Amino acid sequence: MAKKSMIVKALRKPKYKTRQKNRCKLCGRPKGYMRDFGMCRICFRNHASAGLIPGVSKSSW
């Protein structure tokens, strides 16, 4: 879990666009961010396996 201060800091609009850092909307993790879903890979995996993300299923071949 990210510190609350870091999450609040990331939510503020930066002075320059290049300073913006994408963070997971659920846990605040800055790395492993998936832009299409707005969450990190760990939260994505948990939600996908629980069936909370429509249209996403575990692949097998």
UniProtKB/Swiss-Prot annotation:
One of its GO terms (biological process) is translation. This is Small ribosomal subunit protein uS14. Binds 1 zinc ion per subunit. SUPFAM superfamilies: Glucocorticoid receptor-like (DNA-binding domain). Zn(2+) binds at C24, C27, C40, C43. Pfam families: Ribosomal_S14. Its cofactor is Zn(2+). The lineage of its organism: Bacteria, Pseudomonadati, Spirochaetota, Spirochaetia, Spirochaetales. Binds 16S rRNA, required for the assembly of 30S particles and may also be responsible for determining the conformation of the 16S rRNA at the A site.
